[in-house]
Amino acid sequence: VARQIDFGAVSTPFDSLPAAEAVAVHPIQDTFVCGRRFISYKHRTLDLSVLGELPLICLEGDTSTRRYMDAFLEQNHASVHPEFELATSDMIVQFALRNLGVGCVVRDFALPHLQSGKLFELRFNKIIPKREICIVRNTKNPMSTAAKNLWTIIENAQQKKENTL
């Protein structure tokens, strides 16, 4: 018997199925980070087209983050050709720390280095829309007892969070 997963974590936007139920659990912000090599860009508000002139470090093309950023940049007429396409966001941060280029990552991955001042974020005249990490399940598939309990905890935590806003 083929076993289905109970639920998974995905980032928005995603193609939803009719039987899918999603709970947004964490907002995420995509950003471009770099080190001292690019200090001349630090206090400037840039046009997104500048990214076409910089050595970009991005995730590989088959990720939802990469597809999202490619679509955002295309909508804003910014043509980019990454210098490096890496498998993980952690690797992108490490390349940016070594001044090998400007990394495109979810801000959470670079946060410790942004707070320490080892990296800084580029600022643009267009705001990159925030996204969400969601827990998604197929309502047609029965969940195990443990999965049901965890799903309830996730839903309750999210409702509590929404009520405090």
Give the ranges of each region predicted by the language model.
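Short beta-strand-centered segments that line the small-molecule binding cleft or hinge
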Residues: 1-30, 34, 97, 122
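Hydrophobic hinge/microswitch elements
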Residues: 1-4, 11, 70-121
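Short secondary-structure boundary segments
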Residues: 12-13, 36, 107-109, 125-126, ...
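Flexible hinge/capping segments at coil-to-helix
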Residues: 19-57, 61
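Secondary-structure junction motif
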Residues: 40-41, 55-76, 143-147, 151, ...
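A late-sequence structural motif
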Residues: 120-162
